[in-house]
């Protein structure tokens, strides 16, 4: 370490400490009849995404990626999958960079693992594996920021 460096410069800026399934639920409410009803049909599959962050220690944060997927056919649920996939991250960054990294980069790192869990759960549930397309966490961050600004403007 040179005189110009500080100890924090030697530390990784972003460290993944652990990843885990915080909550997982999968159900096929109409089975076995729903398997017959969906033959040759393409259900509507809306995907709801949310990211929550909590501080768990000095520079350590839990980031939880929430996915709720409900396959619908003629207004009836074929399957419902809810996943909360979390990671604990240590950040050694300037204060102004922490919030965007927690809500953009950390969920981007978690997403491939959550995507794999979704594919495995649907396949193991007797359905074709649902392969989620990549998510744009930058756009989600911008939408969330715009929503918060609108709420603050109304207050």
Curated annotation (Swiss-Prot):
- Cross-referenced InterPro entries, in alphabetical order? SecB, SecB-like_sf
Keyword flag Heme = no
- MF terms (GO), sorted A to Z: unfolded protein binding
Location comes to:
Cytoplasm
Any Pfam family hit? SecB
> Where does it mainly reside?
cytoplasm
Quaternary structure note: Homotetramer, a dimer of dimers. One homotetramer interacts with 1 SecA dimer.
Q: Check the record and name the PANTHER family matching this protein.
A: PROTEIN-EXPORT PROTEIN SECB, PTHR36918
Q: What name does UniProt use for this protein?
A: Protein-export protein SecB
Organism, scientific name: Paramagnetospirillum magneticum (strain ATCC 700264 / AMB-1)
- Write the lineage as a comma-separated list: Bacteria, Pseudomonadati, Pseudomonadota, Alphaproteobacteria, Rhodospirillales
């Amino acid at each position: 370490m040179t005189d110009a460096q500080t100890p924090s410069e030697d530390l990784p800026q972003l460290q993944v400490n652990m990843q885990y399934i915080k909550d997982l639920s999968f159900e096929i409410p109409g089975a076995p009849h729903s398997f017959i009803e969906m033959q040759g049909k393409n259900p509507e599959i809306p995907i709801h995404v949310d990211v929550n962050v909590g501080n768990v220690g000095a520079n350590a944060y839990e980031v939880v990626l929430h996915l709720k997927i409900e396959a619908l056919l003629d207004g009836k649920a074929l399957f419902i999958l809810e996943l909360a996939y979390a990671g604990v991250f240590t950040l050694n960054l300037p204060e102004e960079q922490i919030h965007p990294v927690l809500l953009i980069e950390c969920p981007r790192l978690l997403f491939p693992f959550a995507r794999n869990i979704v594919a495995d759960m649907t396949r193991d549930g007797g359905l074709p594996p649902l392969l989620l397309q990549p998510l744009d966490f930058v756009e989600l961050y911008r939408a969330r920021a715009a929503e918060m600004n609108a709420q603050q403007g109304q207050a």
